[in-house]
From Swiss-Prot:
Ranges in a coiled coil: none
Record PROSITE patterns: ATPASE_C
Name of the molecule in the record: ATP synthase subunit c
Residues of the site described as Reversibly protonated during proton transport: 61
InterPro entries linked: ATP_synth_csu_bac/chlpt, ATP_synth_F0_csu, ATP_synth_F0_csu_DDCD_BS, ATP_synth_F0_csu_sf, ATPase_proteolipid_c-like_dom, F/V-ATP_Csub_sf
Originating organism: Gloeothece citriformis (strain PCC 7424)
Role summary: F(1)F(0) ATP synthase produces ATP from ADP in the presence of a proton or sodium gradient. F-type ATPases consist of two structural domains, F(1) containing the extramembraneous catalytic core and F(0) containing the membrane proton channel, linked together by a central stalk and a peripheral stalk. During catalysis, ATP synthesis in the catalytic domain of F(1) is coupled via a rotary mechanism of the central stalk subunits to proton translocation. Key component of the F(0) channel; it plays a direct role in translocation across the membrane. A homomeric c-ring of between 10-14 subunits forms the central stalk rotor element with the F(1) delta and epsilon subunits.
Record's keyword terms, sorted: ATP synthesis, CF(0), Hydrogen ion transport, Ion transport, Lipid-binding, Membrane, Thylakoid, Transmembrane, Transmembrane helix, Transport
Gene Ontology molecular function terms on file: lipid binding; proton-transporting ATP synthase activity, rotational mechanism
One term under GO cellular component: proton-transporting two-sector ATPase complex, proton-transporting domain
Superkingdom field: Bacteria
One Pfam family named in its UniProt record: ATP-synt_C
Gene: atpE
Amino acid sequence: MDPMLASASVIAAALAVGLAAIGPGIGQGNASGQAVSGIARQPEAEGKIRGTLLLTLAFMESLTIYGLVISLVLLFANPFA
């Protein structure tokens, strides 16, 4: 494999994971903060808020996992080589 192509693939893989983690990380922080605020205001709705929060966090985390999969494809099954 061309060394330039290999180094570009490594940089692209690092950017894929890094950029894919920024948005969900910020979103998870905001969602968790709002859930804590909602539970503090209405403690009787804790179960419903927590269930919705966990489902939402799982969907947000899937975006990061997609970035990880793309980076693994770039590193080990490089379509450009």
